[in-house]
Amino acid sequence: MKRTFQPSRIVRKRRHGFRARMSTKWGRRILNRRRAQGRSILCA
């Protein structure tokens, strides 16, 4: 059985990147929550 984590920079950015977060209402909520926490890194 292969490992579940098969790294891909393209898939990582498309699924969890800034523009992916901004494209949905819930994604923007995630960003706002992370900003409120004071995170320096908001997303992948």
UniProtKB/Swiss-Prot annotation:
The keyword Lipid biosynthesis does not apply. InterPro entries: Ribosomal_bL34, Ribosomal_bL34_CS. One of its GO terms (molecular function) is structural constituent of ribosome. Keywords: Ribonucleoprotein, Ribosomal protein. One of its GO terms (cellular component) is ribonucleoprotein complex. GO terms for biological process: translation. It comes from the Bacteria. Pfam families: Ribosomal_L34 (PF00468). Belongs to the bacterial ribosomal protein bL34 family. This is Large ribosomal subunit protein bL34.
